[in-house]
Regions:
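C-terminal motif of bacterial Sec signal peptides marking the signal peptidase cleavage site
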Residues: 16-17
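Beta-propeller blade termini and top-face loops
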Residues: 21-742
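Low-complexity, Pro/Thr/Ser/Gly/Ala-rich linker/spacer regions in secreted
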Residues: 739-755
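C-terminal outer-membrane/trafficking sorting elements
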Residues: 6-9, 750-759, 763-832
């Protein structure tokens, strides 16, 4: 293999060891808000610029086929929080006949249902392939009928990696779901049920975010979703971002189109084909509405439209311009024939394409909410606007009115769910939804109760009690890798987007900038790499396109490498940065680095010489380089992305410092791998886009680990050495943990699994356990979908059917652990 030796003269270090004069690196702003970035898409799409959604689907099916017959099928994850931080909400719906039942759609966390006004929530979409939620619609005639359009429409590639997979319908209040087509329309913005004929359904589709095609527009089904017809296509780069239907006449439909082009290197969020359309014949024909509406292509970006339920002649439309600024709010009182601009909201950010919604109170045509950067409301039809739900988390996306409870309004934003009983004048945040989107994770090395995480748009957060509902922010912006110094845990490092590093010496009470010596002209990854030297807590490494080292706890940094990437890349592509750094715990001179454009490097002399060791490895985004803790010459590397006509895997191992590599992916599906760790028993764990996978035999065989975690992106893994717990940071379902103090992986399949049958399943009042062979007593434990034990029963006899009564157990998905003296298995139970 060709080897590239780089001698990096130490004199270069002196060029960058001087104090950086830029204040931006030394001033920490605790709420840094920038427009959403393409990070998650970029790492999965490199170098082709596309995602293989068919490969993702196959990977999910691979997992489903194995999860209950896996050698690890008896493993249950314990939910580790948080519930009180929240995450991005895309939709909220309230049935017209159930005042305390709400359905909430999360951007990447599925659907949650409550029947007690938000005290308790149940995930009801976890068995499905995609947890990205677009729009929920509930029948007014039978509120057990729910339609769902998958795929988040908010155009933030930093948080959006996968589109949806079409339409789903539930006839039992969300307990079970059936696919109803349109798997290729990308993200679905709106689902409408014809108020007269509920067999007729309309769907607004934005199409795939990162490519042009004609699978977007308005779709119609006249036979309950069995067949679909595209009834409006504006262009191959213009989708439907919002729709409304006349409450009494299903022939009258309004659709707002949005010309939207997003690529890793460019963005266009508006243009001539951003329009409002109306159909008066049930979607057969459409007319563009123009009278009084913006006409200049530069003035037409994302458009939201809503119809008054109390006076259907009144509609409101909210326009952003092509850049994302507020263009105006427009109102019609004649069903759309003519429009007039009313006063508009005041919040002025330049990325209203991230939200920009308008919602009319169903009981009063003059009360309108606008979901912008903050939430604003008018009580007089748009003449004046004022703030409502003041001081909630920014970036508003959803509003729901409870028509059975006057004054009750729910809103959803990037920080979760808020509920008001006073029309927004006062409110409470919901602290029970487990939908936080983690990027990175860390646990205090001396105190397992102090757990840290970096989150999407919800800061760097922590709990000091290992609780699930008491997490608090300590460092602003999008949070990334936190670190805690092992010999003085009052010293904490925290990162926000693009490498903004802060250091606290008072246990997180305050932070100061910690980038002295790193030029602001360097290129930072959205998720900047940073790590400790395991042997010296004062020594840290930090990656831009180069690697920097500090030996005095970030007092100052010096560069120890050349540009390790293949950059600078052409255009606006942000590739060309270090994504992973790892220092051998056996030799501090041995350092590995990986980049977002496929390079893997090693130095064995603390950075004086660097060797490129990736010539035979895939040209994909490197997510993790892991130096072995048991063999100094052993190293692992993992990759994001997909195969395109190539047979390479996503996990590789070297026994000679990277000189040669073995692909240990083997039966692993074609799926991005985001992290790898190894425990004291030699077990390997992978964080992937479909959850956690594990191998007990150095990658010869990979199996799903645990049965109660949905197919959610796992960005980070962390093993806490003292407590011997494995922590998992998910992107949309908060975090989980697992006791690995004993060897949890087995190389043989359980025999108990095939010896037990559950019936009835689904169950209501009780479930029977039927045993093939009698003669032994068993212990039974039932856990909910979040890993909370809800029932335990000992000495269940196998001599006859063991009946377990389900008193007090709500409808939902549960897992029954069955223990014998020598074996254990887990069975899935549906309670309805």
């Amino acid at each position: 293999m060709k080897r590239l030796e780089v001698l990096f003269f130490l004199v270069v270090v002196s060029l960058f060891s001087c104090k950086n004069s830029s204040d931006e690196h030394n001033n920490i702003i605790h709420k840094i808000k920038k427009s959403p970035h393409d990070f998650m898409f970029m790492q999965r799409a490199y170098p082709s610029g596309e995602l293989k959604t068919d490969a993702y689907s196959k990977a999910v099916q691979w997992k489903k086929e194995r999860i209950y017959r896996s050698t690890n099928a008896n493993v249950l994850w314990e939910f580790a929080g948080p519930t009180n931080i929240g995450g991005r909400i895309t939709d909220i719906e309230i049935p017209v006949d159930k005042a305390e039942t709400y359905y909430v759609g999360a951007a990447s966390g599925g659907i949650f249902k409550t029947t007690d006004g938000g005290d308790n929530w149940l995930p009801i979409f976890d068995e499905q392939e995609m947890l990205s939620i677009g729009d929920i619609e509930i029948s007014k005639n039978n509120t057990d009928i729910i339609w769902l359009g998958t795929g988040e429409v908010n155009a933030g590639g930093g948080s959006l990696a996968y589109d949806g997979n079409g339409m789903f319908k539930s006839d039992d209040g969300g307990l079970t779901w059936e696919s109803r087509g349109l798997p290729d329309v990308g993200s679905i913005s709106k689902v409408l049920i014809d108020p007269v004929n509920e067999q007729t359904i309309f769907v607004g589709a934005m199409g795939p975010l990162f490519k042009k095609n004609n699978q977007r527009g308005v779709y119609r089904s006249t036979n309950d979703g069995q067949d679909w017809e595209q009834v409006l296509l504006v262009s191959d780069s213009t989708g439907i971002i919002d729709m409304s239907i006349h409450p009494n006449n299903g022939n009258i439909i309004y659709a707002a189109s949005w010309e939207r082009i997003r690529r890793p290197n460019n963005r266009q969020y508006g243009g001539e084909t951003s329009r409002i359309y109306r159909s008066q014949d049930g979607g057969d024909t459409w007319e563009e509405l123009t009278n009084g509406l913006p006409s200049d292509p530069n003035d037409k970006g994302r458009i939201s439209i809503d119809i008054s339920q109390s006076n259907p002649e009144v509609l409101y439309a909210f326009y952003t311009d092509k850049i994302g600024n507020v263009e105006g709010t427009f109102k019609t009182t004649d069903g759309g024939d003519s429009w007039a601009e009313v006063n508009s909201i005041s919040n002025g950010t330049s990325y209203h394409w991230w939200f920009g919604g308008v919602f009319v109170d169903p009981t009063d045509e003059n009360i309108v909410y606008n979901s912008g950067f903050v939430m604003e409301k008018t009580l007089d039809g748009g003449t004046t606007w004022g703030s409502t739900f003041s001081n909630v988390h920014v970036d508003q996306h959803a509003v729901a009115f409870n028509t059975q409870v006057p004054g009750e309004v729910l809103i959803g934003n990037d920080g979760g769910l808020y509920k008001s009983s006073t029309n927004g004048d006062t409110y409470q945040k919901d602290n029970t939804l487990p939908i936080t989107q983690f990027y990175r994770f860390y646990v205090d090395p001396q105190n397992e109760n102090k757990v840290y995480g970096g989150t999407q748009d919800n800061n760097t957060i922590r709990t000091t009690s290992a609780g699930i509902d008491d997490w608090q922010p300590i460092f602003g912006g999008d949070g990334f890798q936190p670190l805690v110094q092992s010999d003085n845990t009052n010293i904490i490092y925290a990162l926000s987007q693009r490498g903004n590093l802060g250091k606290s010496i008072n246990d997180g009470v305050s932070f100061n900038g910690a980038l002295n010596g790193i030029p602001s002209s360097d290129v930072n990854n959205w998720d900047t790499a940073i790590t400790f030297d395991p042997a010296d807590s004062q020594t840290l490494y930090y990656g831009t396109q180069r690697i920097y080292k500090t030996t005095n706890g970030a007092g100052n940094w010096g560069v120890i490498s050349p540009d390790l990437s293949n950059g600078p890349h052409s255009g606006n592509l942000a590739y060309g940065t270090v994504t992973s750094i790892d220092v051998s715990p056996l030799d501090s001179n041995l350092i590995y680095a990986g980049t977002d454009d496929g390079n893997v490097w090693v130095t064995q002399d603390s950075g004086t010489n660097w060797t490129l060791v990736s010539d035979t490895l895939p040209n994909l985004w490197v997510t993790k380089v892991l130096a072995s803790s048991s063999d100094v010459s052993q190293v692992y590397v993992t990759y994001s992305g997909y195969r395109y006509g190539e047979e390479h895997g996503h996990v590789f191992k070297s026994e000679d410092y990277g000189t040669t590599w073995s692909d240990i992916s083997n039966n692993l599906p074609d799926i991005p791998v985001n992290d790898i760790l190894k425990d004291n028993y030699g077990n390997l764990f992978l964080g992937t886009d479909i959850g956690v996978l594990a191998s007990a035999d150095e990658g010869e065989n990979w199996e799903p680990l645990g049965v109660n975690m949905p197919s959610v992106v796992v960005n980070d893994l962390h093993i806490h050495e003292n407590s011997e717990y494995l922590y998992v940071a998910t992107y949309g379902r908060s975090s989980y943990k697992l006791d690995i103090s004993n060897n949890i992986l087995s190389t043989s399949f359980t025999t108990l699994a095939s010896a037990i049958t559950l019936y009835p399943n689904p169950a209501s009042d009780y479930v029977n356990l039927s045993f093939i062979e009698a003669g032994e007593d068993y212990k039974i434990e039932i856990y909910d979908a979040l890993g909370k034990k809800v029932l335990e029963k000992n000495n269940v006899s196998s001599s006859s059917d063991g009946r377990i009564y389900l008193n007090g157990i709500s409808a939902g998905i549960y897992y029954i652990n069955v223990y014998s003296d020598t074996d254990q298995t887990t069975k899935k139970l549906v309670v309805n």
